[in-house]
């Protein structure tokens, strides 16, 4: 009976796991045209766009989809999104259309079918500008940044024709644009489905993506509750100070060493990997320059001048040890994207993790004084007693070879020589200013997103899955159920 109860409980647990586990839509790469000077062109994988399989259960999925136009009816106006479906083994572009509470893809194909299973073009990072660019057959080839669809064509559209009604007023019901594709054969043409028939046009619009050429990261704040700092004392350099003269004198040397300064600022969905990025940290006059999502290492060097006074024929060993620190922490910040041909930037709040390794401080250590000749330690002054036949006690001083025994260890001095790079990192300083939690609303739109409804360009934003809260609640419930099951 007990075994049956366990089996039933296990079955229920597996069913709940299937129900509560968030399903992630499949994603596929997007290719764009990047070389307008060649006939064939060069295809490059987009760092900000993806094709994502449509999930009718995800009510928030389409908030980051690329718009292809508007659908107008007497009852409602709603955006159409760029989609694709495989027909006879070839990907065909189209636009979405609402049927009740779900969407279908209306393919730009002579079969003119409506498909339930399709991919939607998603601007996941929205730090790449996506917009429709006017095209005509006398233009020089395929526009740079055009988004490829199928074997050798690019996503295009043409405005749907409007007809005056009986009162002479021009109105339009349905899709304001017919989506299709640009065929670059010869001078090129845009093919769409219009009135359920294929039509070709010498002009229209082509969907293009403009990626940023650099980033800037500002307003950085660490989450101090989750900051981890590890320290490790490392030997940097060891040197011998020796007096080869015949008198008590000062000896000095320069100690040189190198160390690595590493920094990695994490990655983020939709942000181009490897793009030049300037990091503006608090109290840093000059921003650090890295490549986004790549580890950046600098080889740094420092010099320390060390001196002391020694007796003839003696020496000491001096060692510099460094406190090497590794800091890891979640952080929030504002990422700015910059584009060629535009003075405006697009900014977005992001959250990621930073990891830094740096030399925080340098300490001096030195050995006891020893003889250069045989390496034995030079003794210090001591007092002993000897007893004579008259039992008189005399204080005497014992000594070894010259020089006279030293009374105390020498003072060793160290000072900086040249530019110094070690010291507490600026991120450590921000820990005193950071709140205990820096969570941001990932759904916020970019602060400088265009509010002009007539400007058909998709800008800034980071794709998120609103099912995250459901997943957290589901995880808690699964933990509870698992605990109950194990107790049976």
UniProtKB/Swiss-Prot annotation:
Residues 22-465 are extracellular. GO terms for biological process: axon guidance; axonal fasciculation. Residues 380-400 have a biased composition (Low complexity). It is found in: Membrane. Coiled coil: none annotated. Glycans are attached at residues 35, 232, 317, 374, 448. PANTHER family: AGAP009604-PA, PROTEIN UNZIPPED. Required for normal axon patterning during neurogenesis. This is Protein unzipped. The gene is uzip.
């Amino acid at each position: 009976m007990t075994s049956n109860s366990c089996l039933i409980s296990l079955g229920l647990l597996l069913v709940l796991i299937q129900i509560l586990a968030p399903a992630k839509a499949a994603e596929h790469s997007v290719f764009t045209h990047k070389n307008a000077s060649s006939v064939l062109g060069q295809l490059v994988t987009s760092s900000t766009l993806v094709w994502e399989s449509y999930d009718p259960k995800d009510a928030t999925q389409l908030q980051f989809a690329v718009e292809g136009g508007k659908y107008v009816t007497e009852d409602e106006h709603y955006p159409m999104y760029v989609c694709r479906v495989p027909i006879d083994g070839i990907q065909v572009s189209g636009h979405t259309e609402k049927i009740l509470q779900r969407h279908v893809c209306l393919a730009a194909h002579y079969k003119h079918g409506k498909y339930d299973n399709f991919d939607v073009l998603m601007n996941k990072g929205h730090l790449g500008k996506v917009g429709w660019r006017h095209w005509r057959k006398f233009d020089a080839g395929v526009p740079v940044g055009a988004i490829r669809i199928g074997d050798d064509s690019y996503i295009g559209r043409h405005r749907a024709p409007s007809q005056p009604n009986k009162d002479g007023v021009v109105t339009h019901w349905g899709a304001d644009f017919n989506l299709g594709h640009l065929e670059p054969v010869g001078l090129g043409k845009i093919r769409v489905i219009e009135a359920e028939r294929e039509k070709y046009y010498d002009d229209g619009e082509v969907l293009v993506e403009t990626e940023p050429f650099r980033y800037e990261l500002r307003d950085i704040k660490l989450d101090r509750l989750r900051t981890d700092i590890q320290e490790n004392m490392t030997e940097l350099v060891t040197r011998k100070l020796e007096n080869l003269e015949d008198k008590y004198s000062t000896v000095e040397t320069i100690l040189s060493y190198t160390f690595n300064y590493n920094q990695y600022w994490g990655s983020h969905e939709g942000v181009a990997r490897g793009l030049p990025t300037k990091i503006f940290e608090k109290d840093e006059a000059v921003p650090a320059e890295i490549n986004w999502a790549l580890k950046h290492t600098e080889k740094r060097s420092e010099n320390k001048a060390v001196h002391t006074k020694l007796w003839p024929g003696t020496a000491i060993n001096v060692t510099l040890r460094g406190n090497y620190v590794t800091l890891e922490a979640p952080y929030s910040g504002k990422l700015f994207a910059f584009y060629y041909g535009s003075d405006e930037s697009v900014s977005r709040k992001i959250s990621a993790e930073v990891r830094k390794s740096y030399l925080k401080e340098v300490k001096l250590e030195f050995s006891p004084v020893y003889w250069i000749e045989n390496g034995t330690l030079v003794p210090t002054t001591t007092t002993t007693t000897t007893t004579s036949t008259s039992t008189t006690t005399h204080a005497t001083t014992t000594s070894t070879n010259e020089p006279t025994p030293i009374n105390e260890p020498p003072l060793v001095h160290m000072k900086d020589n040249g530019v110094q790079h070690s010291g507490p990192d600026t991120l450590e300083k921000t820990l005193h200013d950071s709140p205990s939690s820096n969570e941001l609303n990932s759904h916020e739109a970019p602060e400088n997103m265009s509010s002009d409804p007539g400007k058909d360009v998709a800008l800034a934003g980071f794709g998120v899955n609103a099912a995250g809260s459901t997943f957290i609640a589901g995880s808690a419930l699964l933990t509870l159920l698992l605990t109950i099951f194990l107790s049976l």
